[in-house]
Structure formats: structure tokens, C-alpha cells
Amino acid sequence: MLDSSARQYIVRPNMYRTLLRDLCFLSLLSMVCLVPACKKPQRSGIVIGSKFFTEQVILAELLAQRIEARTGIPVERKTNLGGTLLVHKALLAGQIDLYVEYTGTALTAVLNEPPDRSSSAAGKGVADPVYQRVKQLYAQRFNLEVTEPLGFENTFAMVIRGEDANNFHVRTISDIVRYAPRWRVGVGYEFLERPDGFHGWTDFYHLQFAETPRVMDLGLIYRVLVDRQVDLVAGNSTDGLIDALNLVALEDDRHYFPRYDAVPIIRKSTLDRFPQLGAVLSELGGKISESDIRKMNYAVDVTHRDAAVVVREFRATKGW
């Protein structure tokens, strides 16, 4: 069981409330798209959005502060909007101008392209074939600009308890094949349904678990793992809670997952209105390391610090 201090920094949203909120927001977006006569006046500034987890809120705040400092353009924050497809639809509908996506997610969940596992052995950043494919297709299909990667990858992490990693001497996903029939799994609802998610992963590694995966909000997965309600969860590699709770992320030794480089995506119409944004976003290319984002995630998730304050302090250390 988690002690009282650990419980304080585990988020406990209800998954079904999250799904209901997403559906309601999608309905509102649909009404906006179906009523062209109700044309909105052009904004004097921009709106930056985010998905519904800590890292996304941090990245939205980082972009907002950087843009405000460098250009003086007013920035509205619309964070915690929901999952991948909902935020993508908000971008297409003009409800937001900009958000940070992950290249592997864009390829599989948005573009419905098969995972490109060659990227694991190829170059990273702009040299990555997944990045190049996503950049090309987002421009062609959506009239969106995929800017330079920020410098870190946030891939799916198959996470187990540290004591189990030591007791069973496992460090890679292939190592757990023999134990999987006795193990229970917890996943987020998006990972369960994605083409690069649970079913493809288990087939690729020939994994069979004790029961159907338990689907839950991402804010709950580490709690149920530490509480021994499950034995493995699908988390994110940059989560600060992995180290905080003495958990171990297994190595994807057969390179199932493509690269998931963090990239800002912006409407080209927004770039037309504010061409200076292109230079500001390019300046951030390659400037945020995996260690940087993990420390910021830890500060917000574990020590309960405000994301805006954490970002300001990070920018100060970088001289931004």
C-alpha cells in the first residue's frame, strides 16, 4: 500500500468523467464546425492547448511563456482538454492554435499509419523517418505545420515494481514472457485502442497475461501498481513518478514502439497572422532534454509545485 505522503501526489480523476467530458467537448467542436454563419472574430492573440496530463500542461506553459517573452503576443492557455484526438480536432477547428504532439502518436493515432519501427534504429529529431512522414502528411492533409522536435522523446513505458524487477531478474520486455501468464496489467483507455498499443504490443512480443487488461485513467496506474492490484502498467517514459515510487521501466529490446519525439504543431493560418512564431518555435528545437522534462514532471506531480512557477525557474536556468 502507498503511505500517506505518496497518496498525496497521485491524481485520482474518474475515467468515465474524463470520457464524458471529452465527448461533450467533441460535440461542441462539431457544432462550431457545422455553423459557418457564426463566424468568430479574429483573435488578437493565440491559444495554446494541451492534453490531459502533467507533461502536456508543462509544455503548453513553456511555449506560452517563451512566446510572450519573445514576441509580446497575448497567449491564452487551454490545458487539460482531453486525449489525442480531441485536442487534434480542437486544433483543426481553430479552437486552439498550437499544442505539443508526439511523432509516433501523430503517425498511428491521428494519421492511422502503421508504426514505423525503423525509426528506433535511425536518427532522431528531424532525421527520424517518423518525424519526416508526420511533417509531410500533416501539411498535406491538415494544413498544419510540424515544427522542430523539442529534444526529448516520451515513449510508452512498460513499468513494473522495482522489487519484482530484482526478484525475477528482468530488465527487458522479452524477459517477462515467462512470467506474464501470472501477471495482471493496467493500461490507459487510449493505449488499449491505439494501433501501436496493447494488442499490437502483446502480439509482437508473444505475451499472454492472466486476465483482460484493467483500463483506467493515467492518473491511477502507478497507484494500482504499487498497491499490487496489477503487476505491470503502460506508463510514459518521462513520468517523474517512476523514480519516485521505485519502479522500473522495461527496455523495449525488440523495438516495437516507434519514436515519440515531442513536437509543437501549429496552424499555418496562425503562422500567416504571426510569422514571428516560426522563429520562436525553431529556437526551442533540441533545447529540452529527457532529463529536463522528467525533473519538471517530478516537481509538479510529486512536490505539488505550480507548473507556471516550475517553467519560469527552468527558463531562468537556461537563460531564456
Q: For the regions a protein language model found, what residue spans apply to each?
A:
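Short helix-initiation/N-cap motifs at beta->coil->alpha
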Residues: 76-89, 211-223
